[in-house]
Amino acid sequence: MTTQQYIRIDIPQGVLNGRTTAGQTTSDQTLIERIAAGDKLAMRVLFARHHVRVYRFALRLVRDETLAEDVIGEVFLDIWRQAATFEARAAVSTWLLAIARFKALSLLRRKGEEALDEDAARAIEDPADDPEVAVRKKERSEILRRCWSKLSPEHRDIIDLVYYQEKAIVAVAEIIGIPQNTVKTRMFYARKRLAELLKGAGMDRT
C-alpha cells in the first residue's frame, strides 16, 4: 500500500510546501507530532516535503524504480504508524533516511540481490553547455561511475550520505547506526580510495 492510497484528502493551496495560511513554515517536528495524533493532512505535507529526496536515496540503493517506490511506501507507512516513537534526537529527515536505508537493504536481502550505485555519479546535463562541454561531462560521469562501482558498499554508503544527501557526520552515524569516529574513518578511506581510482583512470579528483 502506498502513501497516496491510505491518505486521501483535499489539500488547501499552499499546504504541500508546509506553509500555514499565515505564511509560516510548519516544522517537521510539529508535523510528526500531528501525525502521531492521526492528522492525515500533516502526513501529506511531510510526504510532499521529503518524498523526492527519500525516493532518490532509495533508488541509488536498489537501482530499480519499482523497488524504490515500494521502499517509499514502506517508509511513509512506518512514519504513519510509528510517529509517536520519534525521539527528536536527530532531524526528521535523518530518521526518514535511516528507515529508507533499512527498508532498502532488507528488500535487497529478501530478493537475494546486490545493488551497485550507478546513478549517483551521473552528471546532470546543463542545457547551456556547448556540445564539447557536454561530451566532457558525459566522459567524466562514466569514469566516475566506474570508479564508484569499485568502492565497497560501506564506502559508497558514506559518500552518498555526505556528498549527495549533504548529511553531517552525526546524522550519518545515526542513519547507518555506527559511531561518529567510525563514520570519519570510513569517510577518510572512502575518499582516499576514490581518489586513487580516479587517478588511475586518468582523472584526478578536484
Regions found by a protein language model. Give the residues of each.
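Structural recognition of an alpha-helix C-terminal capping motif at a helix-to-coil junction
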Residues: 56, 70-77, 90-102
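Intrinsic, short, N-terminal disordered tails of RNA polymerase sigma-factor systems
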Residues: 1-33, 37, 45, 49, ...
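Sigma70-family region 2
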Residues: 36-37, 60-65, 73-91, 110-111, ...
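DNA major-groove recognition helix of helix-turn-helix
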Residues: 108, 187, 194, 198
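Hydrophobic positions on the alpha-helical face of helix-turn-helix-like DNA-binding modules
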Residues: 75, 99, 159, 172-173, ...
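Residues within the DNA-recognition helix of helix-turn-helix
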Residues: 50, 186-189
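Arg/Lys-rich amphipathic alpha helix in sigma70-family domain 2
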Residues: 81-88, 98-118, 137, 189
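Conserved RNAP core-binding helix
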Residues: 31, 47-48, 55, 65-82, ...
